[in-house]
Regions:
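A short, exposed helix-loop element centered on a Lys and neighboring polar residues
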Residues: 168-169, 227
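Conserved mid-core segment of classical short-chain dehydrogenase/reductases
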Residues: 120, 124, 139-154, 173, ...
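Catalytic Tyr-X3-Lys loop
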Residues: 138, 146-165, 198, 222
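Conserved glycine-rich cofactor-binding loop
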Residues: 51-55
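Catalytic loop of short-chain dehydrogenase/reductase
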Residues: 176, 180-221, 226-234, 244-246, ...
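C-terminal helical subdomain
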Residues: 11-19, 23, 240-241, 257-333
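The beta1-alpha1 cofactor-binding region of Rossmann-like NAD(H)/NADP(H)-dependent oxidoreductases
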Residues: 80, 109-121, 150
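Conserved glycine-rich Rossmann-like NAD(P)H-binding loop of the short-chain dehydrogenase/reductase
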Residues: 69-85
Length: 333
């Protein structure tokens, strides 16, 4: 099966918007580093990361552990990879945890994220969780629709969207069962317990690369799905995160060769950004929205008023009046 070259792509594609921030990041930096600004930021958190055997998921697991998470749940279809990541976490955190943080509990669970029963067993075994990162993904070969393999097309949709749905559904049900959204504390402390869901989106969700008729629309679905969680679940901090252009095994196998030179971002970039989203109240104005790990977080926070007032970073049809609730009518941050 031949990969579709860019030269065959249509030329009249939608125009791109100007960059949201001027500082574009490609690797970990102090503001999102668990060794610097985010040291101990994840203390007390229990985190489940799907697709955590390699690539971005592996980096996210290590970053949360280094930031002080009390429990990391690793899951994918490959036990060997997960065991290796568990060993890495234990070695990386040994002698680097405060007495308050204690040891990081690392659980390994092999699961089929497209099987509801398997997902239910996963979340039962995981126990109480504070953060879910839906990182598992798949990428179909870049070919025109007429030449596509239906099984590859469906597999991409199943893993990227259906798997995200099943994991999020199980996470939300477990969260509600333990009182998430209800008032915590006594007396004047009316804070409500919140949890966080980070869904893996893509810059491709806002673009049209002929040949990726499932992956890119599927990531647009992830953006919209994230919005639904946001508007349905006030106590859930949810984000659709583009992890950057990372040369993962999937990208190497399925992305056209002419794109490989642009895949220069480090998986640690997305990992640090995910820790920042999950632990920083400065990120609250981004709840429900698409966000890119390439965007410098300090510049992003400086754009808060502009993003909120102009209602940016939602997925919509330009020119069509909005039928979803306006963000400021639902949650004010």
């Amino acid at each position: 099966m031949l990969l579709l070259p860019l030269a065959n792509a249509a030329t009249n594609l939608p125009k791109s918007a100007p960059p949201l921030v001027s500082a574009v990041r490609h690797d970990m930096y102090d503001a999102i580093s668990p060794a610097h600004a985010l040291a101990h930021a994840a203390q007390g958190l229990a985190v489940l990361i799907t697709g955590s055997g390699r690539g971005v998921g592996r980096a996210e697991a290590l970053a949360f552990a280094q930031a002080g998470a009390k429990k990391i749940v690793l899951t994918s279809r490959s036990r060997d990879e997960l065991d290796e990541v568990k060993k890495e976490i234990e070695e990386a955190t040994r002698d680097h945890r405060t007495p308050e943080e204690g040891e990081c509990e690392v659980l390994v669970h092999v699961a089929d994220l497209c099987d509801p029963a398997s997902v239910d067993v996963l979340f039962e075994a995981a126990g109480e969780l504070d953060v879910l990162i839906n990182n598992a993904g798949y990428l179909e070969p870049c070919v025109p629709i007429r030449d596509s393999d239906p099984s590859e097309w469906k597999r991409t949709l199943d893993i990227n969207h259906y798997g995200t749905y099943l994991a999020t559904r199980a996470f939300l049900r477990a969260a509600h069962a333990r009182g998430v959204g209800e008032e915590q504390g006594v007396g004047g402390d009316n804070a409500k317990k919140e949890v966080t869901v980070i869904n893996t989106s893509s810059i491709g969700s806002a673009g049209t690369r002929p040949g990726f008729s499932c992956y890119q629309p599927g990531k647009s679905m992830i953006n919209r799905f994230t919005e639904f969680v946001h508007f349905e679940e006030p106590a859930v901090r949810t984000f659709a995160l583009h992890p950057g252009g990372v040369m993962t095994k999937l990208a190497r196998d399925s992305m056209p060769p002419d794109t490989h030179d642009s895949l220069t971002d480090k998986p640690e970039l997305a990992a640090g950004f995910a820790v920042w989203l999950a632990t920083s109240r400065k990120a609250d104005f981004l709840r429900g929205r698409y966000v890119s790990a390439n965007w410098d977080v300090d510049q992003l926070v400086a754009k808060r008023d502009e993003i909120v007032q102009m209602d940016l970073l939602w997925t919509r049809v330009v020119g069509q009046e909005q039928v979803m609730p306006h963000s400021t009518h639902v949650h004010l941050y």
